[in-house]
Amino acid sequence: MGILYSEPICQAAYQNDLGQVWRWAKESNHYVDVQDSFNGDTPLICACRRGHLRIVSFLLRRNADVNLKNLKERTCLHYAVKKRFTFFDYLLIILLMPVLLIGYFLMVSKTKQNETLVRMLLNAGVEVNATDCDGYTALHYACQMKNQTLIPLLLEAHADPMIKNKHGESSLDIAQRLKFSQIALMLKRAS
C-alpha cells in the first residue's frame, strides 16, 4: 500500500524505517540525496510525504539538500505543507471524538507534528518560494487547505503571497476565491 520506490533508502524513508535509512546513509552519504528513478523523490521528500519527523530530522542532520526537486518540480516543503490526515487518522478521530475528546487531541497532535515538520525544513533553508510544475508554492497549498497554522510560518519565512501559479492565481487569489477572509487578510498584510 502506498508508493513503491526503486531506491531502497527512499522506500525506507517512506515507510519510516529509520534503521534502514541509517544503514544506507552510513554506507554512503550520497544516498541522502539520491533521487528515485520513477518520480525523482529524494529520501527527504519521501519522509515529508508521510510526515516522518525522526527520518526528516536524521536526513537534515546528514545535510540532505532541502531544495532538490522531484519530477513534479516539488521540494520537500511542498509535501510537508500538503500533508493531510490519512483515512486512518480521520477514522480514529471520528471513533475517539466522543471518548473524552481523545479524537480532538489526536487531531491537535497531528497538526503540531506537521507544524514541526515545516519548521524543521524552513530552519534548514528550504526555498520557501519554490514552485512546482503547476507553479504552486507551499503557500498556495497552505491557502487551499485553509491551514492557518502554517501560513504565518511561511509568511514569516518570506513566502511571497503574490506569486502566481500557471492558472494565474496567487495565494491571495486562492484565499479570496475560497472565501477564507482571515487568510486573505493575513496575506494582504504580508504583501
UniProtKB/Swiss-Prot annotation:
Coiled coil: none
Gene3D superfamilies (alphabetical): Ankyrin repeat-containing domain
ANK repeats (start-end): 39-68, 72-100, 101-130, 134-163
Keyword field: ANK repeat, Repeat
SMART domains tied to this protein: ANK
InterPro entries assigned to the protein according to its UniProt record, in alphabetical order: Ankyrin_rpt, Ankyrin_rpt-contain_sf, ANR22
Keyword Repeat applies: yes
Domain of life: Eukaryota
Official protein name in the record: Ankyrin repeat domain-containing protein 22
